[in-house]
Structure formats: C-alpha cells, structure tokens
Amino acid sequence: MAYQAKLRVWRGDEDGGALQDFSVDVNEGEVVLDIIHRLQQTQAGDLAVRWNCKAGKCGSCSAEINGRPKLLCMTRMSTFDPAETITITPLRTFPVIRDLVTDVSFNYEKAREIPSFTPPKDLQPGEYRMMQEDVERSQEFRKCIECFLCQNTCHVVRDHEENKKAFAGPRYLMRQTELDMHPLDTHDHRAVQAQDENGLGFCNITKCCTEVCPEHIKITDNALIPLKERAADRKYDPVVWLGNKLFRRG
C-alpha cells in the first residue's frame, strides 16, 4: 500500500551541512535507495548518493539510517513505521564529499598495508593444491563486499580520529586472518604483524562490526578473536616459539 514517508536527509559538503526534511511517496516492496532515487527525480535533483548494483553485492550505497550503518539498497521501507521520520546521513567515520557520499580512501590505504598472498617460491601457477577443509576455513571471509560498514561502526576510529593511522580496522584485520589461515602463504607471522603494525590490540571485541555486516560474516568470533589468540601464542608461548624456529614455513 502506498503512503507518504517523512525523511530527513543530510545535505552538505566538506564545509558543513544540515538535515533537510522531505515527504515522498513510498510504494509496496521498495527499499530506501528507491526513495532516494525518487527524491532525486522529484524534489532534489542534485542530491548526491553513491550506488551501483542495487542488489547488495557491490557495497557502494553504504550510509547511516536512523544512526545505524546500513546498505540503502537492502533496507526495506516496510521495516519502518509509516508514521516515523527516517533520518539518512553519510557514514560518520569518513570525510564527507557531498551529501551522502563520503571519502572512503582510508580503507584503500589500509588495504595496501596488508602484505599480499605469498606462495612458496618452488610452486608454479597451476601447481597450488589445498585440502577442501582449508578452503572452507576462510570461505566466509571472502564473502566481504567491502561496503566498509564494519570500518565505519568500529568505535576505535568512529569515536577516535587519532587512531586511524595505527588501526587497520576489522575488514583488513579479517584479511590478515584469511591469509594467515592459508596453508600456502609463506609470509611470516601475520598475526604478530597485525598486533604490532595493524593495531589489533585496539580491538576490544564488542562485536559491533559483526552486527552491521550485511553478509553476516562473524568477523569478531571467526577472525579477530582467533587472530588475537595466534598473536599471543606466537609472541609469548615458548613451545610455539621453538616450533617456529625449528619448522619455519618457506
């Protein structure tokens, strides 16, 4: 059933802005991104929003809806009371470019800090072999669509801008975990590197990153906590230390 929704949408740029009120038609089955597009068509032709696939697979349309990080294309209007006012704002952790579009280059800088997969030197392409159970261990992490909702909601950088230089964020700590689990990766001590160089110690496992993940990846339980455990083992367990000396990979 169609109805008129009340929206408050943040309008502005890097120099500042404010929430602007709108009333817009909503049809059955629509998502928030549909309503933003209708606003562009009928009332705010210059409203800036980043989007691409409209299928929850590209991660482009990340924003905050009523203060909670979400994908605009995966948030159905039917989840809201028709009488409530829906507030849509840009991702708070990243600098605003214009309206709902933010500069997420922080994440690409952090991606470059993570050493890439390092295969054994004596193996040629086409010679890599893995057990299926090893493939499945990190399969969950490869579902990431890099929407950066986890990066945005993590209070380590959301509430503390000064931590950005030292903290890679849950998405890229998860990447370290994925590679550390890979049986053919020969890069030494990724878990220790995550602790010493990527700010793993800043994470206090509040699970806020897991809660906002649209792919339902258990980032905290399956990536961050195991990475913390391996970092502690490799730095402080004398048996593990001796084993690493005797049986160093690569």
Model feature map: region roles:
Residues 30-42, 89-250:
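Ferredoxin-type iron-sulfur electron-transfer modules in oxidoreductases and energy-metabolism complexes
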Residues 2-107, 141, 151, 155, ...:
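Iron-sulfur-associated redox domains of electron-transfer enzymes in respiratory
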